[in-house]
């Protein structure tokens, strides 16, 4: 079980209370698909992903980015038991979708980068530490089925 300080919980809840899912989600997933092109193999049904412009303008990528970001709400609502909260998604991604678990970390990093760009100076070192701790726990939970 992860121990969360009151400060960490406050920071994480504050981030999500102001999060623009429709902006951050598509940008983060697009960034992941552009920067790490091998991750595109999981999105073959999304249509044209041939270049950065196509990825950024792809409605399926945008919709899935929003869905992924809303998936973090599951962790937010279950801070005391994030592993169990993601057990079903871990199984889905490992057994049915066969997603490389390293991709969760790559997407997590992209979410953090896009969030940092959006928050600017408000994305302090303390904010980053709390957010990345949260993301690391979610990534670990999603990868649990692989262990």
Curated annotation (Swiss-Prot):
Residues 3-147 form the Globin domain. The keyword Amino-acid biosynthesis does not apply. The keyword Cytoplasm does not apply. It comes from the Eukaryota. GO terms for molecular function: haptoglobin binding; heme binding; metal ion binding; organic acid binding; oxygen binding; oxygen carrier activity; peroxidase activity. Disulfide bonds: none annotated. GO terms for cellular component: blood microparticle; haptoglobin-hemoglobin complex; hemoglobin complex. PANTHER family: HEMOGLOBIN FAMILY MEMBER, HEMOGLOBIN SUBUNIT EPSILON. This fish has two hemoglobins: Hb1 (major) and Hb2 (about 5% of the total). They display the Bohr and root effects. Hb1 is a heterotetramer of two alpha chains and two beta-1 chains. Belongs to the globin family. This is Hemoglobin subunit beta-1. It comes from Cygnodraco mawsoni (Antarctic dragonfish).
């Amino acid at each position: 079980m992860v121990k969360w300080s009151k400060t960490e919980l406050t920071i994480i809840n504050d981030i999500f209370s102001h999060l623009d899912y429709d902006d951050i989600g598509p940008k983060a997933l697009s960034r992941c698909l552009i920067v790490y092109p091998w991750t595109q193999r999981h999105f073959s049904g999304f249509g044209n992903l041939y270049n950065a412009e196509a990825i950024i303008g792809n409605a399926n990528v945008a919709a899935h980015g929003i869905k992924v970001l809303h998936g973090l709400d599951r962790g937010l609502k279950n801070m005391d038991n994030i592993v169990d909260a993601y057990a079903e998604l871990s199984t889905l991604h490992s057994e049915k979708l066969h997603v490389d678990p390293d991709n969760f970390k790559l997407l997590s990093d992209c979410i953090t980068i896009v969030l940092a760009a959006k928050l600017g100076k408000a994305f302090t070192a303390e904010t980053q530490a709390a957010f990345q701790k949260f993301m690391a726990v979610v990534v670990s939970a999603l990868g649990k089925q692989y262990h």
